[in-house]
Amino acid sequence: MISLKNFGLLFWKRFSENKLNQVAGALTYSTMLAIVPLVMVIFSIFSAFPVFNEVTGELKEMIFTNFAPSASDMVGEYIDQFVSNSKKMSAVGIVSLIAVALMLINNIDRTLNSIWHNSQSRSPLSSFAIYWMILTLGPLIIGVSIGISSYIKIMFEQSEHLSLGLKLLSFVPFLFTWFIFTLIYTVVPNKKVKIKHSAYGAFLAAIFFTLGKQAFTWYVVTFPSYQLIYGAMATLPIMLLWIQISWLVVLVGAQLASTLDEIGEQIEQ
């Protein structure tokens, strides 16, 4: 049985070897390039299903709040404008935007597989099928989840005897974040990952992500140095900083799950 100290040393060694700080920066750059194509694809899929019209507003709020907690309104206006402009694009332009979105998913795939030290790659056809499924089915799954949460919330609000349930409902965003991270850490690596290890890494990432979002919002509001220095352009560095923090949290959770897997394999041997 490995001690907590040795586990911490191994975790930090793998974190340094994988250069996760630099990787988070690279993913931030990729995300900034792909955010408009991703949002365009997501809301195009939603518009094709009238049943999701009622939850589109909630989905927008969730996306904008997670990408820029302190500047969600301004970011929302910009992205609405970008998506509106994308509707005027030609077929070639739309294909190009989708390709950029798929490239981001490919970068995430390669990054997580490198954390698990997995050199075995999928075939191009298999990779494309998985990326396309994520790009198309992902928004539908999120939409269904938001719709169910909204329905349950309305049901609790209409009942005077379910106030406890309404309070418990406040944990749904955290549980949903935990579930998404667990799914990513389990499915994306091209090797068998124990779900309990994925869940441990995802739990840590979900805690850091939730607390980090609150702390980041508090810092930006309390110490508005970015607004003083950058003025009207303050949204851009704020958004860049938050996206990098978010990716670092995702990678830390992945590294924890990978380290647990590595230790488990050593014990089994």
Swiss-Prot record:
GO CC entries: plasma membrane
Primary location: membrane
Localization of this protein: Cell inner membrane
Ranges in coiled-coil conformation: none
Membrane-traversing stretches: 32-52, 89-109, 128-148, 168-188, 203-223, 232-252
Superkingdom per UniProt: Bacteria
Keywords: Cell inner membrane, Cell membrane, Membrane, Transmembrane, Transmembrane helix
Membrane topology: Multi-pass membrane protein
Pfam family, one: Virul_fac_BrkB
Homology family: Belongs to the UPF0761 family.
Name assigned to this protein: UPF0761 membrane protein NTHI0384
Higher taxonomy: Bacteria, Pseudomonadati, Pseudomonadota, Gammaproteobacteria, Pasteurellales
